[in-house]
Amino acid sequence: MSFHASGREFSCEVGDYSLSVVTVGAGISSLKWKGRNLVLPHKVTEVAPGWSGKMLLPWPNRIADGRYSWNDREYLLPINDRGTGTALHGLAAWVPWEIVDATASHVRLESFIAAQEFYPWPLTARLDLRLDPESGLNIELSAKNLGDSPAPYGASLHPYLLGGTTANDSILSLPASHIVDTDENLLPTGINPVSAAYDFRIPRMIDDLFIDHCYGGLQGNWEVRVTNAQGEGAALASKTPWVQIHTADALGRPGLAIEPMTCPPDAFNSGIDLVSLAPGQRHRLSLSIRGQ
């Protein structure tokens, strides 16, 4: 058994879809439809660029100064984004996950997230990836609280969808009516109706617009589409109340990060849509990615 920078890799193929997943962070390292990349790919021998494909829990996005309070106790998380002084994207993205079940169309990975001083609730995390020839890749990310007290919890994942040759010539369709305004550290300052510059309810080209924003006002089952001018690209569907959109500028804008989130940034402090995960309770986040 050999290991690489991103652990080990599992691949499967159903109909026109093919999938690869790596064991570090349970990262989706490749998803293709009719031979065309739907997400930004990377090799198992490489470190995933910009959190690409990673599972984000027990919190998505940022926690200000790494500090939060829960049940009248204060906690201090490690700061892993020095530029903003924040704790970013949880505890599961860079740890080993284990492939516990695999078939021709499905793979399940699991990971144990140990209790630590700054997050003293042990969790078991589970990722189910299932390929369907019609609906594409169906995903369920879940976690169970193994501790003896309620745990603060949120989740997301971090695929970069590909439409045009870059984000600039990609057309974005995003049915969100509100946006989270942020400060210089990308931390929330308010939730407001989306301004014209960031409104993609009518699909349009991104051009050189910088986006690193959380959107809300999503209704029921929603779908975000990223395509080229010919309508070819990828669509992500979920029913989370929030989605982070990012133009991946540090990577050269190769695609668009579409991160369905159960809560907005800094939810450990604001409490907005933060899950109180009871002992023995399992939380589930579902979504799908398809080609078009």
Predicted feature locations:
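Acidic-aromatic substrate-binding/catalytic surfaces of carbohydrate-active enzymes
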Residues: S20-E74, N80
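Active-site/ligand-binding surface loops and adjacent short beta/alpha elements
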Residues: L77, P150-P152, Y160-S238
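Short Pro-Gly-centered flexible turn/kink motifs
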Residues: Y68-L76, L141, S276-Q292
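A short, structured loop/turn motif at beta-sheet edges
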Residues: S69-R73, V100-V107, R130-G136, G163-D169, ...
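Short, Gly/Pro- and small/polar-rich lid/capping loops
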Residues: M1-G15
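Glycine-rich active-site loops that engage anionic ligands at enzyme catalytic sites
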Residues: V226-P265
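Acidic, contiguous internal or C-terminal segments within carbohydrate-active enzymes
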Residues: L19, S111-Y153, L157-P159, G164
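Extended, loop-rich substrate-binding clefts of extracytoplasmic carbohydrate-active enzymes
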Residues: M1, D81, G85-P133
